[in-house]
Amino acid sequence: MRTYHYIPLFIWTYMFHTVDTILLQEKPNSYLSSKKIAGLTKDDGKMLRRTKRGWMWNQFFLLEEYTGTDTQYVGKLHTDQDKGDGNLKYILTGDGAGSLFVIDENTGDIHAAKKLDREEKSLYILRAKAIDRKTGRQVEPESEFIIKIHDINDNEPKFTKDLYTASVPEMSGVGTSVIQVTATDADDANYGNSAKVVYSILQGQPYFSVDPESGIIKTALPDMSRENREQYQVVIQAKDMGGQMGGLSGTTTVNITLTDVNNNPPRFPQSTYQFNSPESVPLGTHLGRIKANDPDVGENAEMEYSIAEGDGADMFDVITDKDTQEGIITVKQNLDFENQMLYTLRVDASNTHPDPRFLHLGPFKDTAVVKISVEDIDEPPVFTKVSYLIEVDEDVKEGSIIGQVTAYDPDARNNLIKYSVDRHTDMDRIFGIHSENGSIFTLKALDRESSPWHNITVTATEINNPKQSSHIPVFIRILDINDHAPEFAMYYETFVCENAKPGQLIQTVSVMDKDDPPRGHKFFFEPVPEFTLNPNFTIVDNKDNTAGIMTRKDGYSRNKMSTYLLPILIFDNDYPIQSSTGTLTIRVCACDNQGNMQSCTAEALILSAGLSTGALVAILLCVLILLILVVLFAALKRQRKKEPLIISKDDVRDNIVTYNDEGGGEEDTQAFDIGTLRNPEAREDSKLRRDVMPETIFQIRRTVPLWENIDVQDFIHRRLKENDADPSAPPYDSLATYAYEGNDSIADSLSSLESLTADCNQDYDYLSDWGPRFKKLADMYGGDDSDRD
């Protein structure tokens, strides 16, 4: 609390409580009950009677925030029963008794033991009583009184927030409310101006002002622009005592932001933009970006781009990038340098959310000129059509021209073009094409029935730049000609009952034709000219591409004729007329009365061959026995043990011993065909190799095709040069094994062979075991020791 404000407060208290305050400070007070008459005693002992304002004795007043060194005097309690002899004792109870307030039990003087704060508690209720020390009885009934704490201006105003945040739209008029700030003062508002707060602005002029009583902050300047300044800091002061000098004050800070309104149109930073584009770019390609600047923010800065006019409005398009607010120039139609090299566009940028309040400022859009230069590139040939359809009769001769494709070079240089057929689409090489003019011709005969359609691809390539090529599909439809005769649609197993009657239908036949005439099939049936009048059966044309076979006589006999062959002439109505003869086999069968077949001519056929059932069984048994004998003979021959040629591994008599065994090398099993040296179409087949040595694997080189009339010597020299120039070949000093001839000999060298100096050291008896051919040699070296002596 601030102590320098006590003197004015004392003066104010003196004005309202003149007499009471003087008497309280000069003489002791006596506390009387409501039945007594309160009074004051002076030094001369005379009683001053008071009949008015007796209630003042029921309350005391005390200033807060006392800073003196002694205890603060509150007042004095006194009763008429007190004779001054010390027999009475004053007792104080209630709020703060004994701690905040103490009483002299002999004199009744009350003092404040501590400094008091009205803001903490402004009113204390206490009770006082006087008792006789000797008897302990109350000489006066207990009575209640009040101590009120008088306020002093010891609290400055405080705002509800230390920092306020507010916003106001830019371009607002003067007096637009922004925010209201509020400050409170803890002092007593009922006494004086200690709690009367007045607001003023310390920082923020001349942009803002504050209402001194309500604390409402308002705009003070018109048309403040966010683009010029967006943030403002305003300091507001609240001062008590009605703003008079000596009042306490507090401050707060208000951060005010100007919010954006759409008061600025978009503007291009430059009036002309230049872009380049190759003529071969695909549709939808982004050529470049343009951007108009808008100082507004948020949705107020959103804009949309459009092509207003220009000679390329149908060739290009502009797309708005919502994230970057840029206009993207894209290709809408295919470009052609030869047709037009430069396009000029006018592109508009306009706000999508204009504010009607600011439309008077002008149109919220801007226009820029975009120039697009088309760059010439070497383009591939272009066919005059996207695809070709060729129709050709299937009987066209080989080498005949059936159609033509045409391509041109769109470049200004107009390079020459050659045509070819993609053989991946014509594996059988049925068609060819003249490379100069694109005429397509046949290389083989055509057959609609095997392949009615052929889909090939023709390539057009620039002669000067083979990398530039185009492809076009060519659909070749083979048209049908009447080159197939009609024939039976299926194999018919026809029978006739022995008890059949004349005119009975025994079979209906239909035919098929591999041809496909445009007007549909129409077939006719007739007997063959050699048998125009058949005594057994009649052919009836049903006029619906079918024919019925009718019996012509009464009854048939299996014994006389078990099978009839009926030739039928079938022909169509297309040009040229094709015909064929189909023979229908009709068996004679035994049937019941309803015409159901019971048995047919199988037995009759067997009997007609002159073989009975027993004979057939005998033949089958003989064949079976013969097969068994052959199998047994083969099994015995495989089980026969061969006689060993050499009984002992050391016996080499009468045997051929091969010493030049070259096994272990490449496991080639086929000899080299020298005939391929003179075959220009020869190719080396890649074989799997399992080389033993060397272990280094080199890249396989393809054989260069040989032309005719090159002899073997030239070929070998040519291959030798290729091998010498091959970078993948091993160096000259590397070890190359061409023929692996087995392991080394047991003998290290010829020096290991030595002659025996004594015949006694050699035993030649084994020569006699070598057979008759070595008998003479055995006799010469295998004699007894006595003979040798």
Swiss-Prot record:
GO biological process: adherens junction organization; calcium-dependent cell-cell adhesion via plasma membrane cell adhesion molecules; cell migration; cell morphogenesis; cell-cell adhesion; cell-cell adhesion mediated by cadherin; cell-cell junction assembly; homophilic cell adhesion via plasma membrane adhesion molecules
Record's keyword annotation contains Phosphoprotein: yes
InterPro entries assigned to the protein according to its UniProt record, in alphabetical order: Cadherin, Cadherin-like_dom, Cadherin-like_sf, Cadherin_CS, Cadherin_Y-type_LIR, Catenin-bd_sf
Annotated signal peptide: 1-21
Pfam family membership, one: CADH_Y-type_LIR
Spans within the Cytoplasmic topological domain: 637-789
Principal place of residence: membrane
Top-rank taxon, per record: Eukaryota
Bilayer topology: Single-pass type I membrane protein
Compartmental location: Cell membrane
Function noted in UniProt: Cadherins are calcium-dependent cell adhesion proteins. They preferentially interact with themselves in a homophilic manner in connecting cells; cadherins may thus contribute to the sorting of heterogeneous cell types.
Protein name per Swiss-Prot or TrEMBL: Cadherin-9
